[in-house]
Curated annotation (Swiss-Prot):
Bias (Polar residues) ranges: 470-479, 507-521
Pfam family, one: eIF2A
Biased composition (Basic and acidic residues): 495-506
Highest taxon of the lineage: Eukaryota
Coiled-coil region: 532-583
The WD repeat ranges on this chain: 23-63, 125-163, 356-401
Protein name as annotated: Eukaryotic translation initiation factor 2A
Function: Functions in the early steps of protein synthesis of a small number of specific mRNAs. Acts by directing the binding of methionyl-tRNAi to 40S ribosomal subunits. In contrast to the eIF-2 complex, it binds methionyl-tRNAi to 40S subunits in a codon-dependent manner, whereas the eIF-2 complex binds methionyl-tRNAi to 40S subunits in a GTP-dependent manner.
Any Gene Ontology CC annotation: cytoplasm
GO biological process: regulation of translation; ribosome assembly
Entry GO MF terms: mRNA binding; ribosome binding; translation initiation factor activity; tRNA binding
Keywords: Coiled coil, Initiation factor, Protein biosynthesis, Repeat, Translation regulation, WD repeat
Length: 586
C-alpha cells in the first residue's frame, strides 16, 4: 500500500483550509474551509490523525481522515493549542488577566480530555513562553515549571503531584524523547558569583547532586536552549549572554556545550568567531550540525566526540534543517538574507542543488523526506505572502500566491509517525516541473560609461571558503604537531618552497618540450551525471574499452592473442551499447 500524501494546513485572512500534498496540490475536499478571518491557532496531533483550531468563537477538533467533528469547546480567546503525544489531552492557553479588584484572575491554561470533552485541570500560566506542559512520549509523565521547581504528574492525573524537582531556581527544563526511562535536563541560572549549570536526571531519581547523570556549569549564560537527540543519549546546550563584554557583537555572546547521559561533557570548539545561528541534531543521533560565525557564516557537522566531520565552508546562511530520515541536509539563509539554500547529500557530502527562495520567513520538510515548503508569512512580511512546495533537487512543484489585499499567517505540514514513509535513494537530477525555474537573474552592478569596455576588477570583501572533509584519511598516521615542531616547520618552509619552485621550473621546461613532440589526438571533455554510482560505472566501462583498443592494436601488429583476450574484443559492441545507454541517461 502506497503511503498517504501529507496535507498542508494554511491559515490566513482568507480563512483556514487544507491543501493535498504532492503530487496533486489541490484544496482538500474532505476538510471544509473555515472562512472566518479570525483563526488564531491551529495544531495537528503528533501522528497527524487529529486537527484542532480556534476560529475566534470556538475550539474545534476533527478527525483528519473523515473531517468528522469530534469535540467543540466555547473558548473564543484561545491563542495556543497543543495535543499530548498519544492524543488523550488537548492543552489550550489564552492571555492571563487579573481580576479588577487586583486579586488573582481565572485560570487560563486548560487541559481537556479529547475522548470525553471534560476539563481535567485548569492552571494559572501568566507567561506565554513555555506555556504548555511537557509529556513523555508514552504520556506516563507530565511536567510543569511552577515557581522555579518542576512538578511531575503521572498517568494524566493532574490532581496529585507525584514528584518535585527542586533546585535553587529552575529556569527551564526539557524532557527526553523516546521510550522509558524518561530523563530530564534542567537549567539553573547563576547568581551571586556562582556559575549557571545544566544537569541531567533520570526520573524519578532527584535526591541530591549525586543522583544527577551529568552536570555542566558555565559562567557566560543569561539564557540557554537545550536540545535532546532522538535517542536521548545527549543534550546540546546553546548558552547565550545578552551583552558581549568584548564589544564584538551587539547581540551578546554564545557558546555551545555537549552533555551526555553517561557523564561526559565538553565545549564544542567552533573554528570561527561570532554568533551561533542554529544547531540541529541529525535524526540518527550520532552527529549534529552547527551554523556559526560572523557573515559569511560557517557550517560544520560534528560527531559525538565534538570533532568536526565535514566543513561546508562559508556562505550566506543562518539555518540548518535535516530531512526526517537524516539523509539530506539543507543549509539556508532566511530573514535578513536572500533565501539561498544548499541541499546536501549527507552520506556522500555531495551538493545536490542550490535553489533560492527569496523573502521566505518559514521552512519545513515534508514528512515524506522528499518535499519542502517555504513560505512568506505576515506579520514578518506583509507583502508577497504565499508558499512554494519544492522537490529537494531544486524544482518548484507548486506555487500559491495570496491576493495583494490578503495575508497568510501560517502553514503547517500534517505530521506522521516514524516509519510511514520509507527512505528513498538520493537523486541529483532535478525532477520535472510544469512551473518555470525560480532562479532569479543575478543583478548587474552599475558601471559608469568610461569603465564599460574595460575588464571588471574583483571587488569582493572576502573570499568564501570551500567545503572540506574533516575526517582523518584512512592509512594516514599523522599526529598533531607540538608547538616546538610547528615553530621549526615554519622556519624550514621558505627553504623548502624555494627548492620546490626550482624543481617545478625544470619539470615545466621538460614537459613543454615533450608536449611539442607528442600532441594529443583529441581533448575529450569529462561529462558527469551528478550521481556518483553512474559516474563510477562510466569510468569502468571507458577503462575496459581502452584496454580492448590496445588489444586490437596488438593484433593488428601481428601479435598472437590469448583466448580470453579475444573474448574481451568480442564484448566491445556490448560495452559500447551499455556506455551509450548510461550517457543518454545523464
Amino acid at each position: 500500500m502506497a503511503p498517504p500524501a501529507p496535507l498542508l494546513a494554511v491559515r490566513g485572512s482568507e480563512g483556514l483550509f487544507m491543501v493535498n500534498g504532492p503530487p496533486s496540490f489541490t484544496e482538500s475536499a474532505v476538510f471544509q474551509r473555515d472562512s472566518g478571518r479570525n483563526c488564531k491557532a491551529v495544531a495537528f496531533s503528533k501522528d497527524g490523525s487529529l486537527f484542532a483550531w480556534c476560529n475566534g468563537e470556538k475550539v474545534n477538533i476533527v478527525n483528519v481522515t473523515s473531517a468528522g467533528l469530534l469535540r467543540s469547546f466555547d473558548l473564543p480567546k484561545v491563542v495556543c493549542l497543543e495535543f499530548s503525544p498519544k492524543n488523550n489531552i488537548l492543552a489550550t492557553w489564552q492571555a492571563y488577566s487579573a481580576a479588577k479588584d487586583g486579586t488573582a484572575g481565572a485560570p487560563n491554561l486548560q487541559l481537556y480530555d479529547v475522548k470525553t470533552g471534560k476539563c481535567l485541570k485548569s492552571f494559572i500560566q501568566k507567561k506565554m513562553q513555555n506555556w504548555c506542559p511537557c509529556w513523555a512520549d508514552d504520556e506516563s509523565i507530565c511536567a510543569r515549571n511552577v515557581n522555579n521547581e518542576v512538578h511531575f504528574f503521572e498517568n494524566n492525573n493532574f490532581n496529585t503531584i507525584a514528584n518535585k524537582l527542586h533546585l535553587q531556581k529552575v529556569n527551564d527544563f526539557v524532557l527526553s524523547p523516546g521510550a522509558q526511562p524518561t530523563k530530564v535536563a534542567v537549567y539553573v541560572p547563576g547568581s551571586k558569583g556562582a556559575p549557571s549549570f545544566v544537569r541531567l536526571y533520570q526520573y524519578p531519581n532527584f535526591g541530591g547532586p549525586q543522583s544527577a547523570l551529568a552536570n555542566k556549569s558555565f559562567f557566560k549564560a543569561d539564557k540557554v536552549t537545550m536540545l535532546w537527540n532522538k535517542k536521548a543519549t545527549a543534550v546540546l546546550v546553546i548558552a547565550s549572554t545578552d551583552v558581549d563584554k568584548t564589544g564584538a557583537s551587539y547581540y551578546g555572546e554564545q557558546t555551545l556545550h555537549y552533555i551526555a547521559t553517561n557523564g561526559e561533557s565538553a565545549i564544542v570548539q567552533l573554528p570561527k568567531n561570532g554568533p551561533i545561528y542554529d544547531v540541529v541534531w541529525n535524526p540518527n543521533s550520532v552527529e549534529f550540525c552547527a551554523v556559526y560565525g560572523f557573515m559569511p557564516a560557517k557550517a560544520t557537522v560534528f560527531n559525538l566526540k565534538c570533532d568536526p566531520v565535514f566543513d561546508f565552508g562559508t556562505g550566506p546562511r543562518n539555518a540548518a534543517y535535516y530531512s526526517p530520515h537524516g539523509h539530506i541536509l539543507v543549509l539556508a539563509g532566511f530573514g535578513n538574507l536572500r533565501g539561498q539554500m544548499e541541499v546536501w547529500d549527507v552520506k556522500n557530502y555531495k551538493l545536490i542543488s542550490k535553489p533560492v527562495a527569496s523573502d521566505s520567513t518559514y521552512f519545513a520538510w515534508c514528512p515524506d523526506g522528499e518535499h519542502i515548503v517555504t513560505a512568506t508569512c505576515a506579520p514578518r512580511l506583509r507583502v508577497s505572502n504565499g508558499y512554494k512546495i519544492w522537490h529537494y533537487t531544486g524544482s518548484v512543484l507548486h506555487n500559491y500566491e495570496v491576493p495583494s489585499n490578503e495575508e497568510m499567517w501560517q502553514v503547517s505540514w500534517q505530521p506522521f509517525l516514524d516509519g510511514v514513509f520509507p527512505v528513498k535513494a538520493v537523486k541529483y537530477q532535478a525532477v520535472p516541473s510544469e512551473l518555470p525555474s525560480a532562479e532569479p537573474k543575478p543583478a548587474q552592478a552599475y558601471r559608469p560609461p568610461a569603465l564599460r569596455n574595460k575588464p571588471v576588477t574583483s571587488s569582493k570583501l572576502h573570499e568564501d571558503e570551500p567545503p572540506q572533509n574533516m575526517k582523518p584519511q584512512s592509512g594516514s598516521s599523522e599526529k598533531p604537531l607540538s608547538k616546538t615542531a610547528l615553530k621549526n616547520q615554519k622556519k624550514h618552509e621558505p627553504k623548502k618552497a624555494a627548492k620546490q619552485e626550482a624543481k617545478a621550473d625544470c619539470s615545466q621546461e621538460s614537459t613543454q618540450s615533450s608536449a611539442s613532440q607528442n600532441t594529443p589526438r583529441s581533448a575529450v571533455p569529462v561529462v558527469t551525471s551528478g550521481d556518483p554510482e553512474i559516474d563510477k560505472k562510466i569510468k569502468n566501462l571507458k577503462k575496459k574499452l581502452k584496454a580492448i583498443e590496445q588489444l586490437k592494436e596488438q593484433a593488428a601488429a601481428g601479435k598472437q592473442l590469448e583466448k580470453n583476450q579475444l573474448e574481451k574484443i568480442q564484448k566491445e559492441s556490448a560495452l559500447l551499447q551499455e556506455l551509450e545507454d548510461l550517457e543518454l541517461g545523464l
